[in-house]
Amino acid sequence: YHIDGFRFDLTKGFTQAASTESSASNYDKSRIEILKDYHAAIKEVKPEAYVILEHFCDSKEEKELAEDGMHLWRNMNNAYCQTAMGWNDDSAFDGLYESIPAWIGFMESHDEERAAYKQTQWGDEALKTDLTTRMRQLEVNASFFFTVPGPKMIWQFGEMGYDVSIEENGRTG
């Protein structure tokens, strides 16, 4: 096997501080130190390894982790779903153009509903009912997604029209 790096899921849970659902995303210096220690240990063994975090915490905390060389997920699901459905509200992609070059943007994931499915449920006019129109809109979405600078996470071909809900037959559709 050739391992390029490691992805850590739900890293806001990597803490020794007590927290609740509402406070887990607050700035936590101890969590930063734990993740920096893991990062250093990985780099000691393989200096070119990627370390990717599903973090979703305070922006100051994410900035510190990025400055240490780690990459962080950047959830753009809502914006891409809004454009896929033909809606302008909340459809800006500017979250991927922030000053932190360590963002790994994504349109969909195992935690987020698929854009093509949302088109069939809440799409504007023909986007809801016409497959050809939906696919053309998803092509435009993919064009924006793939041309934004930086790395991308692609998950189960949502950009190609996977229109089954993630809730069908359990969490993975």
Positions of PLM-derived features:
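An active-site-proximal structural segment forming one wall of the substrate-binding cleft
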Residues: 1-7
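Active-site-proximal helices and loops of the catalytic beta/alpha 8
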Residues: 10-112, 120-124, 133-136, 143-147, ...
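Active-site-adjacent loop/helix micro-motif of nuclease/hydrolase catalytic cores
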Residues: 116
